């Protein structure tokens, strides 16, 4: 009789413990549905309070040339696949072409598609997953065609941002630090084009975002209402780069100020050989930072911009999943 009671008691404890475990780890499963992970968050959160995985030079997946790929290819998945894998920050860089279009570039290298390709894919994705938000960084990355008569920003504003085909796609609210509820189904602009007449998104002021080259830096944006904290030391070697990434992660972890915007680049410029290619750097940096994020648990990371987003090396944690699951 005593044995039966003991067995019953242990069974009850196991059931209770199991229920507690699954309840306590419910939010760990965000990355199990990467295509709509934002839909499971409190939509009262500001975007700056959400840990967001991003891709660096997001459009470089089109490169096939093996020589150019060593230093210019930073992604191997197309836009829609990146979105489905959980990426929500896209680093789009371009060049103004003679036909008043923006060609997507990585530096001098043309990536064989136009900005409209990204916007069309984002529009399609957000219509399928209307509770998600995409942050799009926009930057001029190469000199305009000699026949261009408008500035890069003017072309973007007139032919894309204000284009009836895309206008409802962009967040156009006045909140400098919008919530997820305000931006669902929208692209929020992260403006690296310089001075602008666009009054919504990050960098929405006359001076734009003042970006320091190859540096960890802080600057005020949106007429001083937000503090942008960036690590973009792309000329570092592995050890120094990892240290720089971890240093900004440590600051974000203990910072509860929603008006601080953390943008942390994991990318390193290639040295031009397979040994120090973007892929090789990513194969070491991504798993190392993923391990750190996992060890930190539910803690603020900010927005982490990575090479080869959605690519998992055998035996290592996937960095996109770890960023998603670190959300509280």
From Swiss-Prot:
Pfam families in alphabetical order: PI-PLC-X (PF00388)
Location in the cell: Secreted
UniProt keyword list: Hydrolase, Lipid degradation, Lipid metabolism, Lyase, Secreted, Signal, Transducer, Virulence
Induction: Less protein is secreted in a secG or double secG/secY2 mutant (at protein level).
One GO cellular component term noted in the UniProt record for this chain: extracellular region
InterPro entries per the UniProt record, alphabetical: PI-PLC_domain, PLC-like_Pdiesterase_TIM-brl, PLipase_C_PInositol-sp_X_dom
Catalytic activity: a 1,2-diacyl-sn-glycero-3-phospho-(1D-myo-inositol) = 1D-myo-inositol 1,2-cyclic phosphate + a 1,2-diacyl-sn-glycerol
Major place of residence: secreted
SUPFAM superfamilies (UniProt xref): PLC-like phosphodiesterases
Signal in keyword set: yes
Entry EC number(s): 4.6.1.13
Segment forming the signal sequence: 1-26
Domain PI-PLC X-box: 41-192
A GO BP entry: signal transduction
PROSITE patterns on file: PIPLC_X_DOMAIN
Active site per database record: 56, 106
SMART domains for this protein: PLCXc
Described function: Cleaves glycosylphosphatidylinositol (GPI) and phosphatidylinositol (PI) anchors but not PI phosphates. Potential virulence factor.
Protein's name in the database: 1-phosphatidylinositol phosphodiesterase
Source organism: Staphylococcus aureus (strain NCTC 8325 / PS 47)
Gene this chain is encoded by: plc
